[in-house]
C-alpha cells in the first residue's frame, strides 16, 4: 500500500490513475484491519487526489476510501471532519461516475459509523450548498440511506425531514424532484406515522396538496404483523378443502411470522416475500445462483439480497424438499465468508438467516451449527456492538434449537483458557444454555467430565461475569448430576462455597434453571390426589382403546372432550357416550394400579411408557410422529364470553370430576376485568383454546370422498388453517374423525405430561413442526390448558420445569393471574409462595416466545398492587428484565410492559425505585433500552411529592448521577438529551442540594463538561450553583475558627463548612477526600476541655451538658439547656453576658462577648477574642449569633500567647482558598507548611496533622500545576518527617498519588511517582497491597501500568513465604492484564512476573499454567536473562 500511495503522488496522470486502481485492488483483497498510521496516510493522500483534474483519479480515490472505510473501523472516525466536506464537494462534480462514487462512499461511511451522524455532518455543508448539483445528489444519497437504514436507525428520518421540506422551495427543478422522491421513500418506510410527522411542520396548503397527490400513488411497506387478514385466510382454507392436492410445497403459504427472532433480537426486518419453487431442479438452480453471488467480489447490497432470497425460499416452503438440507451444505462456505465481512449490515443479515434456518430445521441444522459457531466466536469479541450482539444472539438461538454437542468441547476450551475475557464469559453462557435446554440428551449426559472441568476452572476466573455464570452452571450441574456435584463442591475454595450457598437463596441476573428432574422422589398417585399434569386422570373420563380401531369397536375421545354421540363411517353400529364410558370402566383400575407403580423418572422414559401401555392395547406416540395435530383457533373477533360459551361442553365432564374447568377461569376473569380488557383476554383465550363444540358432522357421502392422502398430510394442512379465521361449519368430517383418533391415541396413554411436552418441545423431526411458531397450536397444547393446573404449587412446578413448552408456562401465569383476581384470599396464597412465584417471573420475563412474555407481564401488572410490600424487595432484580422487553419488536409484548411500568410508577415512590433503576440502567446494553429507563426515571422524579430542598437517598442518588454523567456526552442525541433532562428533574423535584454537592465533587474537567451541558437547557442550575458556592464562603467567613476545634467536612461541602444537619466541634469528620477514591476517614482528636472561669451562674449540670453537646456536635443552641435552666448568664471579667434564652430557641436579648481586646486579637474574618483576666487558660468559649431566627454554634478562638507569624489554622484557611485567596497565598501557605514539616514540632503535628493532610490532598486537584507541585513536595517531606502519623493514612495517600501520577504535566507526574516510590519502599507493604490489588482490574491503561509498577516494587519487599501467600490475591488480575491490547501494559506485566519468578524460582512455574505457551516462554526468557545479569547465573541453573 505504501508503494501505491507513493505512486499516487507522481506528477504523471497515468501513474496516478494506475496508483489509485492498484490501491483499490489492494484494499478490496485485504482482510486485515488498517492501523491508525495507515489510515492517516491513506486519508491524507486521497484528500489531495479528490481535487485531481482527471476525473478518473478522483473516482479511484473515492472508491479506495470506500474500501478502506470497511477496514479502518474506529480509526477513520478521527478523520471524518476533514473527509466528509471533501466528499460532499465531489457530489457536485461534472462527471457522473465521480458523483456516483461520492454517493457510495457516503453510504459506506454511514454503514461503518452512524447514518445519523454522517447525515448531520454532511448536511451542514450539502443542504444549503451553492451548487444545485450537490444539493440534488445529497438528496438522492439520503433517499437511498432511508431505504437501507430506516429500520435500524430511527432518528434518521427526523434529521432529514426538515431540510428536505425546505428543498421543496428550491429554485432548481431537479433538486425539488429529488426532495419529493425522498419524501416518497420516507412515506414508504414510515406509513401513517410519517403523515403525522408531516403535520407538525405546518406546511402551506398548496404544498400539502402536492405531497398528498404524490403519496396517494404509492403503498407504504407495512411492518410484519401477527397473522394475516381474515379474508385471505378464509379463502385459503376453502381452497384447501376443495382440492386436497394443494398441500404440495408449491401451494404452501407461509404462516410464520416475519419477525423470526421471536423476541431475541432488537431489530425489525422488512417483510420477506415468499419465493415458491415448483421442482427440485428449480431449487438447485436457485442455490447455485445464491452461492455464486455470496462471494467477496460482489457488491454488498447484492449479497444481502441473495441472503434475503434464501429466507424467501424458506418462507415459500423449500424446506419440504428432501434435497434442501444437502443444498444448504453448499452455502456453509459462502455464509462463513459473509460472517467474516467487515460490514455490520452483511454480518447482521447472515446471522439473521442462520437464526431462521435453525428455527426451521431444528435438529437437521445441527451439523451446520457446529460449523458456524466457531466462526461466530470471532465476532462475539469484536468492538462493533451491532456485530457482537448479532453473533451472540445467533449462537444462542442455534443452541436453543439444536444440540450442537460436538462443538461443546470447543466452547468449554474457550471458556477456560481464551485470552479474551468477553469470549470466556459468553462461552460460559453458551455452556449453561446447552445444559439448560438439552439436559437429557445422551451426548450431554456423556459430557459430565467436561462440565466439571469447565466449572472448576471458571469459578476462579479473573473476570467476575465468568465466575458468576460458572456458579449458575454449577447449580444446573448439581440438578443434573447430583452425585458428582457434591464432590465438585467440596473441591471449591471456601469463598466460592460461601458465595454459592448465599446465592442459592436468591435469583440472579440470568437466573439459574429449575430442577430438570427429581431423581429420588417416589410420589404415590391416587385418584383423589392425582396432579393435573396427568391428562384426564382424576378430572375427566378415561377411555383406553387401540389407535387403529374404528368407532365400531371403540369410541374415540380426547381427554376432557365429551361428545353426545359418535358414529362410524359405515353407520353399522352406534355407541353412545354412556356405552363408551361403561366399556372403559374395566380398564380404569388397571391404569390406576399401573400408574401407582411407575417411578417419576419412568414418566420421562418413553420405553417404560410403551411397555406399560401395551397391555391396554394403546400405541403411545413415538418420538418421530407428532402425537397431536393442530386445529384452527376461534375467531379473534369473539369476546371472552363467546369463548366461555363455546368451551362449556368441553369442561362439563372435568368439572363433574372435581377438576378446574376452563369456563370457570374465563368467568372469573370476566368478573374481575373491565369490558375492554375482558375482550383482550378473550381474544387471547380464543387463540389459545380452540373450541370443539362448533365442529359439526357432514354427510357420509362427503366423508367417503376424502382420500388417504389428506390424512397423511394432515399436519401440513392444519398449519395453514392456523393463520386466521376459518369457516367451522364447513370443517370436513374426515378431518374431525382423524382428529378424534389422533387425540385418543395421544391422551389415553399419555397420563405423564412431561413426556407429552418433551415430544412436542424437542424430540420431533424438523419436517413435522416449527419451533417457537405461535400460530401452530396443537391438540396436546389445548389439553394442557383444559387440564390446567389445579393448585398454585402445581402451576409453579409446571412453569419452572425446564422441559415444559410455552403453553404450560402461559397456563401457569394464567392460573396465577386468576388467583390474584380472587381478592385478598388469592393474594395471600400467592404471598405464601412468593419466592417461588418470583422465580417464575424472573425465569420467563426473558422468554423468547412472545406469548409467554406477554402472559408474564400481564400477570406481573396484577401482582404488584396485590403484593406491594413483598414485591418491593424483588424490584431491583425484576425491573431490568421488564425494561429489556420495552423495546421488544412485538407490540403485544411492549403494551403490557408499558402498563406494568405505569403501575410500578404509581405504586412506589422514587426513593424505592432508585436502586432498581440504577441496576436497570447498568444492565441495559441497547441505547433504546437505556433511554427507556431514563425516561421512566424522569417521570418518577417529576411525580415525587417531597420537598426538593430536603435531601433524599443521597448514597444511591450519587451513584445514579454518576451513571448519567457520561451519558450527557453520548453520541446518541436522544440519550444525551434524556440524561440531561433527568439531571434537571432531580434538581427541580427531588434533591437540589444533593445535585449541587455532586457537581462540586467532580473533577474540574467533568464539572465543566456537565455544567456546560446543563447550561444549554437551563441557566438556573448554574446560577444556583454559583450562589451556593458563594454562600458557603460567606458562612465560613462569619464562623469562628479555633485551632484546636477545626471544623472539617467533605470536599463536597467545602473546607471548614457546616453540614446541613449538624456541626461537628473539635472532631474532624472528613467525607470523600477524593471523588475517585471515596474513602472516609476521621481524626481521633478530641475537643479541648472547657475549664474554669465560665461564670458562677451556670449550674454544674448545664455546664456538663454543654460540654457533652459540644462533643457530639449538636447544632441547636436550645438543646444545650434543660427547660429548668432557661435563665442563665455567662460572666467574664464583669462585662460580658448572654441573657435569657428560651427553650424553643428564640432570643430575648443577646449581647455578644465584647472585651477590650489586647493587641494580639486575631480577626481574619472570624470572631476572635482574648481574655487575659480569666483564671486559667480558656481554649474554648461559646458564642451565639442570630442567623435567620436560629442559633448556630461556633467556636471561639482564644489566643493566649503571642506569635510572630500566622498560626496553622490561618495557613490552612489561606491554602484552602475559601476566602478567594489568590494562588500566591496558597503557594506561601504550602511553603510555610513545608518549613513546619522540616521543623517537625511534635505539638503542632499531633494537633493539626489530619487537618493539614486533608487540605494538602484537596489542593492536589488545583488547576495550577505549580501549586500541585508544591503540595507534592510537602507530601514528600511529610512522608519523611511525619512517618508515624502518615502510616495511619497511607491508603488514601497512595490512591491520591496514583491519580496525580496520570497528570499531563511531566513535573507533577514525576513528583507524584517519587512520592509513591517513597511510600512503597518505606511503609507497610501489606497496607500498600490492600490499595494496589483492587485497582489491578481497572480499565484505564495509565492507572493499570502504574499499579503493576507499584506491585513490582512491593514484591521485592516480601519474603518468599509472604509472597506465596499473596499470589492468589493478585495473579488472576495480572494474567488478565497480560492479554491487554496495550503494549505498555503487557511489558509492565512481564517485568512484574519476572521479578516474582526470580524470587520464587521453579516454585512459581505451576502458577504460570494460566498463561499460554508464548507468554510463559517470554517470562522465562526474560527471567533467565535478568537473573544472569544480576546474579551471574540463570534461574534454571540455580534451582
UniProtKB/Swiss-Prot annotation:
Chain intervals with Low complexity compositional bias: 632-649
Major localization class: cytoplasm
Region (Disordered): 238-264, 503-539, 611-660, 672-715, 1074-1101
Entry protein name: CLIP-associated protein
Purpose: Cortical microtubule plus-end tracking protein required for cell morphogenesis and cell division. Promotes the stabilization of dynamic microtubules during mitosis. Regulates microtubule-cortex attachment, thereby contributing to self-organization of cortical microtubules and subsequent cell shape.
Keywords recorded for this protein, A-Z: Acetylation, Cell cycle, Cell division, Cytoplasm, Cytoskeleton, Microtubule, Mitosis, Repeat
GO molecular function annotations of the record: microtubule binding; microtubule plus-end binding
Keyword Cytoplasm appears in the UniProt entry: yes
Family (UniProt): Belongs to the CLASP family.
HEAT repeats: 1-32, 36-74, 77-115, 154-192, 281-319, 325-363, 366-401, 402-439, 486-525, 809-830, 831-869, 872-910, 912-950, 954-992, 994-1031, 1201-1239, 1246-1284, 1287-1325, 1327-1360, 1364-1402, 1405-1439
Composition skew (Polar residues), residue ranges: 522-532, 672-696, 1074-1088
Basic and acidic residues: bias regions: 699-715
Gene deletion effect: Various plant growth reductions (e.g. dwarf), cell form defects (e.g. reduced trichome branches number) and reduced mitotic activity. Less root cortical microtubule arrays hypersensitive to microtubule-destabilizing drugs. Aberrant microtubule preprophase bands, mitotic spindles, and phragmoplasts.
Tissue expression pattern: Expressed at a low level in all tissues, mostly in young developing tissues.
Gene that produces this protein: CLASP
GO cellular component terms attached to this protein's record: cell cortex; cytoplasmic microtubule; mitochondrion; phragmoplast; plasmodesma; spindle microtubule
Organism name: Arabidopsis thaliana (Mouse-ear cress)
Amino acid at each position: 500500500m505504501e508503494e501505491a500511495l507513493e505512486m499516487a503522488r507522481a506528477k504523471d496522470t497515468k501513474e496516478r490513475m494506475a496508483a489509485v486502481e492498484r490501491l483499490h485492488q489492494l484494499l478490496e483483497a485485504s482482510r486485515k484491519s488498517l492501523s491508525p498510521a495507515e489510515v492517516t496516510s491513506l486519508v491524507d493522500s486521497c484528500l489531495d487526489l479528490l481535487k485531481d483534474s482527471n476525473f478518473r483519479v478522483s473516482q479511484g480515490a473515492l472508491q479506495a476510501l470506500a474500501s478502506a472505510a470497511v477496514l479502518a473501523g474506529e480509526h477513520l472516525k478521527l478523520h471524518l471532519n476533514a473527509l466528509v466536506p471533501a466528499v460532499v464537494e465531489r457530489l457536485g462534480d461534472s462527471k457522473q461516475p465521480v458523483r456516483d462514487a461520492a454517493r457510495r462512499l457516503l453510504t459506506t461511511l454511514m454503514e461503518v459509523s452512524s447514518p445519523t451522524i454522517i447525515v448531520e455532518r454532511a448536511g451542514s455543508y450539502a443542504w444549503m450548498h451553492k451548487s444545485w448539483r450537490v444539493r440534488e445528489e445529497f438528496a438522492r444519497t439520503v433517499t437511498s440511506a432511508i431505504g437501507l437504514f430506516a429500520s435500524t436507525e430511527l432518528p434518521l428520518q427526523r434529521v432529514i425531514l426538515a431540510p428536505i421540506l425546505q428543498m421543496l422551495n428550491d429554485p432548481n427543478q431537479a433538486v425539488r424532484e429529488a426532495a419529493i422522491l425522498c419524501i416518497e421513500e420516507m412515506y414508504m418506510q414510515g406509513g401513517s406515522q410519517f403523515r403525522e410527522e408531516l403535520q407538525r411542520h405546518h406546511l402551506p396548503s398548496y404544498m400539502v396538496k402536492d405531497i398528498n397527490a404524490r403519496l396517494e400513488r404509492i403503498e407504504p411497506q407495512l411492518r410484519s404483523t401477527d397473522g394475516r387478514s381474515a379474508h385471505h385466510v378464509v379463502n385459503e382454507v376453502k381452497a384447501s378443502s376443495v382440492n386436497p392436492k394443494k398441500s404440495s410445497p408449491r401451494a404452501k403459504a407461509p404462516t410464520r411470522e416475519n419477525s423470526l427472532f421471536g423476541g431475541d433480537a432488537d431489530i425489525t426486518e422488512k417483510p420477506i416475500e415468499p419465493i415458491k419453487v415448483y421442482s427440485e431442479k428449480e431449487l438447485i438452480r436457485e442455490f447455485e445462483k445464491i452461492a455464486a453471488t455470496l462471494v467477496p467480489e460482489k457488491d454488498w447490497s447484492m449479497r444481502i439480497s441473495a441472503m434475503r432470497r434464501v429466507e424467501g425460499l424458506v418462507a415459500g416452503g423449500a424446506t419440504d424438499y428432501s434435497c434442501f438440507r444437502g443444498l444448504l451444505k453448499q452455502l456453509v462456505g459462502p455464509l462463513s465468508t459473509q460472517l467474516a465481512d467487515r460490514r455490520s449490515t452483511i454480518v447482521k443479515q447472515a446471522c439473521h438467516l442462520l437464526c431462521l434456518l435453525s428455527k426451521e430445521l431444528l435438529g437437521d441444522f445441527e451439523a451446520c451449527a457446529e460449523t458456524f459457531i466457531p466462526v461466530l466466536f470471532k465476532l462475539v469479541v469484536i468492538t462493533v456492538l451491532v456485530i457482537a450482539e448479532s453473533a451472540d444472539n445467533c449462537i444462542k438461538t442455534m443452541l436453543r434449537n439444536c444440540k450442537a454437542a460436538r462443538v461443546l468441547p470447543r466452547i468449554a476450551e474457550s471458556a477456560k483458557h481464551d485470552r479474551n475475557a468477553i469470549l470466556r464469559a459468553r462461552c460460559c453462557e453458551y455452556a449453561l444454555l446447552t445444559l439448560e435446554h438439552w439436559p437429557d440428551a445422551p451426548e450431554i449426559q456423556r459430557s459430565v467430565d467436561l462440565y466439571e472441568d469447565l466449572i472448576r476452572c471458571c469459578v476462579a476466573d479473573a473476570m467476575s461475569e465468568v465466575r458468576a455464570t460458572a456458579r449458575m452452571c454449577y447449580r444446573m450441574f448439581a440438578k443434573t448430576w447430583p452425585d458428582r456435584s457434591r464432590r465438585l463442591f467440596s473441591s471449591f475454595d471456601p469463598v466460592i462455597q460461601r458465595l454459592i450457598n448465599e446465592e442459592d437463596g436468591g435469583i440472579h441476573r440470568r437466573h439459574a434453571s429449575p430442577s430438570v428432574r427429581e431423581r429420588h422422589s417416589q410420589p404415590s398417585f391416587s385418584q383423589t390426589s392425582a396432579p393435573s399434569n396427568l391428562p384426564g386422570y382424576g378430572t375427566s373420563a378415561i377411555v383406553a382403546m387401540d389407535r387403529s380401531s374404528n368407532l365400531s369397536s371403540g369410541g374415540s375421545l380426547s381427554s376432557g372432550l365429551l361428545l353426545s354421540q359418535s358414529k362410524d363411517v359405515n353407520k353399522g353400529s352406534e355407541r353412545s357416550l354412556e356405552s363408551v364410558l361403561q366399556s372403559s370402566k374395566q380398564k380404569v383400575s388397571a391404569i390406576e394400579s399401573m400408574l401407582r407403580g411407575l417411578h417419576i423418572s419412568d414418566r420421562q422414559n418413553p420405553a417404560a411408557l410403551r411397555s406399560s401401555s401395551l397391555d391396554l392395547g394403546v400405541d403411545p406416540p413415538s418420538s418421530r410422529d407428532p402425537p397431536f395435530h393442530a386445529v384452527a383457533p376461534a375467531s379473534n373477533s369473539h369476546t371472552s364470553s363467546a369463548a366461555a360459551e363455546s368451551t362449556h361442553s368441553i369442561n362439563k365432564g372435568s368439572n363433574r370430576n372435581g377438576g378446574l374447568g376452563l369456563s370457570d377461569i374465563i368467568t372469573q376473569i370476566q368478573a374481575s376485568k373491565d369490558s375492554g380488557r375482558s375482550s383482550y383476554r378473550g381474544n387471547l383465550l380464543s387463540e389459545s383454546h380452540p373450541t370443539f363444540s362448533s365442529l359439526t358432522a357432514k354427510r357420509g357421502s362427503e366423508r367417503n370422498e376424502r382420500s388417504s392422502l389428506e390424512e397423511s398430510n394432515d399436519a401440513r394442512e392444519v398449519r395453514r388453517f392456523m393463520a386466521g379465521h376459518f369457516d367451522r361449519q364447513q370443517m370436513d368430517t374426515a378431518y374431525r374423525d382423524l382428529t378424534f383418533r389422533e387425540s385418543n391415541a395421544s391422551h389415553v396413554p399419555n397420563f405423564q405430561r412431561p413426556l407429552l411436552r418433551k415430544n412436542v418441545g424437542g424430540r420431533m423431526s424438523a419436517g413435522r413442526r416449527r419451533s417457537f411458531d405461535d400460530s401452530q397450536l396443537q391438540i396436546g397444547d389445548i389439553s394442557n390448558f383444559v387440564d390446567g393446573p389445579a393448585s398454585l404449587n402445581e402451576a409453579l412446578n409446571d412453569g419452572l420445569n425446564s422441559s415444559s413448552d410455552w403453553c404450560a408456562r402461559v397456563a401457569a401465569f394464567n392460573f396465577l393471574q386468576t388467583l390474584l383476581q380472587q381478592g385478598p384470599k388469592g393474594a395471600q396464597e400467592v404471598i405464601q409462595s412468593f419466592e417461588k412465584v418470583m422465580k417464575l417471573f424472573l425465569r420467563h420475563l426473558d422468554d423468547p416466545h412472545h406469548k409467554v412474555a406477554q402472559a408474564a407481564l400481564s400477570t406481573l401488572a396484577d401482582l404488584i398492587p396485590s403484593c406491594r410490600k413483598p414485591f418491593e424487595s424483588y424490584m431491583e432484580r425484576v425491573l431490568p428484565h421488564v425494561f429489556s422487553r420495552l423495546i421488544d419488536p412485538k407490540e403485544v409484548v411492549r403494551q403490557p410492559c408499558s402498563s406494568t411500568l405505569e403501575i410500578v410508577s404509581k405504586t412506589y415512590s422514587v426513593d424505592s425505585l432508585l436502586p432498581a433503576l440504577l441496576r436497570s440502567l447498568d444492565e441495559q446494553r441497547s441505547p433504546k433500552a437505556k433511554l427507556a429507563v431514563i425516561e421512566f426515571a424522569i417521570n418518577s422524579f417529576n411525580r415525587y411529592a417531597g420537598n426538593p430542598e430536603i435531601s433524599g437517598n443521597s448514597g444511591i442518588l450519587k451513584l445514579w448521577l454518576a451513571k448519567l454523567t457520561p451519558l450527557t456526552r453520548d453520541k446518541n442525541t436522544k440519550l444525551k438529551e434524556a440524561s440531561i433532562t433527568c439531571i434537571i428533574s432531580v434538581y427541580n423535584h427531588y434533591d437540589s442540594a444533593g445535585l449541587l454537592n455532586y457537581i462540586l465533587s467532580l473533577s474540574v474537567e467533568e464539572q465543566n463538561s456537565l455544567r456546560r451541558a446543563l447550561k444549554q437547557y437551563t441557566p438556573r442550575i448554574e446560577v444556583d450553583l454559583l450562589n451556593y458556592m458563594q454562600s458557603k464562603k460567606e458562612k465560613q467567613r462569619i464562623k469562628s475558627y479555633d485551632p484546636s476545634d477545626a471544623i472539617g467536612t467533605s470536599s463536597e461541602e467545602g473546607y471548614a463548612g457546616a453540614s446541613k444537619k449538624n456541626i461537628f466541634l473539635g472532631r474532624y469528620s472528613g467525607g470523600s477526600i477524593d471523588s475517585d477514591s471515596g474513602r472516609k476517614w476521621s481524626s481521633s482528636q478530641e475537643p479541648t476541655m472547657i475549664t474554669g472561669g465560665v461564670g458562677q451562674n451556670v449550674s454544674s449540670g448545664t455546664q456538663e451538658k454543654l460540654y457533652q453537646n459540644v462533643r457530639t456536635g449538636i447544632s441547636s443552641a436550645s438543646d444545650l439547656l434543660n427547660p429548668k435552666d432557661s435563665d442563665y448568664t455567662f460572666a467574664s471579667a464583669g462585662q460580658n453576658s448572654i441573657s435569657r434564652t428560651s427553650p424553643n430557641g428564640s432570643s430575648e436579648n443577646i449581647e455578644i462577648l465584647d472585651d477590650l481586646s489586647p493587641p494580639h486579637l486575631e480577626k481574619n474574618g472570624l470572631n476572635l477574642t482574648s481574655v487575659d483576666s480569666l483564671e486559667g487558660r480558656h481554649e474554648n468559649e461559646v458564642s451565639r449569633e442570630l442567623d435567620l431566627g436560629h442559633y448556630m454554634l461556633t467556636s471561639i478562638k482564644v489566643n493566649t500567647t503571642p506569635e510572630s507569624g500566622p498560626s496553622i489554622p490561618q495557613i490552612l484557611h489561606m491554602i484552602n482558598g475559601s476566602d478567594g485567596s489568590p494562588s500566591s497565598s496558597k503557594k506561601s501557605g504550602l511553603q510555610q507548611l513545608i518549613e513546619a514539616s522540616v521543623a517537625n514540632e511534635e505539638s503542632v503535628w499531633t494537633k493539626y496533622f489530619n487537618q493539614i493532610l486533608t487540605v494538602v490532598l484537596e489542593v492536589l486537584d488545583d488547576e495550577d500545576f505549580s501549586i500541585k507541585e508544591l503540595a507534592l513536595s510537602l507530601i514528600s517531606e511529610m512522608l519523611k518527617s511525619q512517618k508515624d502519623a502518615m502510616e495511619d493514612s497511607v491508603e488514601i495517600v497512595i490512591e491520591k498519588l496514583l491519580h496525580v501520577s496520570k497528570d499531563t504535566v511531566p513535573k507533577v507526574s514525576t513528583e507524584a511517582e517519587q512520592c509513591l516510590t517513597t511510600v512503597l519502599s518505606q511503609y507497610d507493604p501489606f497496607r500498600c497491597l490492600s490499595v494496589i490489588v483492587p485497582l489491578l482490574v481497572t480499565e484505564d491503561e495509565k492507572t493499570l501500568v502504574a499499579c503493576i509498577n507499584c506491585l513490582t516494587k512491593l514484591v521485592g519487599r516480601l519474603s518468599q513465604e509472604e509472597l506465596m501467600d499473596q499470589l492468589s490475591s493478585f495473579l488472576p488480575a495480572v494474567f488478565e492484564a497480560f492479554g491487554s491490547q496495550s503494549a505498555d501494559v503487557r511489558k509492565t506485566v512481564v517485568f512484574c512476573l519476572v521479578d516474582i519468578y526470580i524470587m520464587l524460582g521453579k516454585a512459581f512455574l505451576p502458577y504460570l499454567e494460566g498463561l499460554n505457551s508464548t507468554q510463559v516462554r517470554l517470562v522465562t526468557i526474560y527471567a533467565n536473562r535478568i537473573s544472569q545479569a544480576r546474579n551471574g547465573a540463570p534461574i534454571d541453573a540455580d534451582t
